[in-house]
Amino acid sequence: MAITDVVIYPHDIFRKPNSDITVFDENLKQLSEDMFETMYKNEGIGLAGPQIAENKNIVVIDIPEDDGSQGKNKIVLINPKVTKLEGDIVESQEGCLSVPGYQDKVERYERCTVEYQNLNGEHCTFDNVDGLFAICLQHEIDHLHGKLFVDKLSRMKRDRLH
C-alpha cells in the first residue's frame, strides 16, 4: 500500500472539478486502501480524492470507536451526493488534513442523507444520519464540490491562514 502526501490548502486542485468514477476495479480498491493508509498516517477520520491530488469523486471515512481506535468502521463512498439536509444547523469544531494545525467552529446541518456507490458499483444510501458521521460526510463531500471548511469562516479568519 502506498501512503501519499496530503495536498495543503490553498492549492488550486481544491477548486478544480472532479470526475465521476465509472470503472470499479482493483485499481479503485487500491486507491481506496491508499487513501485509508494516508488518512490513518495523518490521524484523520475522512479523506477525499482531491486531498491526495486525485480529482475523482471518492471519499473514505472511518469514525473512531469510543476508545479512539479505527479500522472497524471503514466506509468508501464513490460518486457521493448529499440528497437531503435536515434538522437544526449545529456548530461544531472541525479540522482538515489539508489545513494542518488549524481548527475552528463551523455550522452544518445536524442530519443528512447521502446516496453513493460502493466499491462494486452498487447504489447505496445512508439515510438521515446524524452526529459526527453526518458532519464528516458533509465535510468530505464538500471537498468534491471545491469547498473546504475554511470557506465557511469569515474572510478575516481565512486571510490569516495564508
Regions found by a protein language model. Give the residues of each.
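Positively charged
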Residues: M1-H162
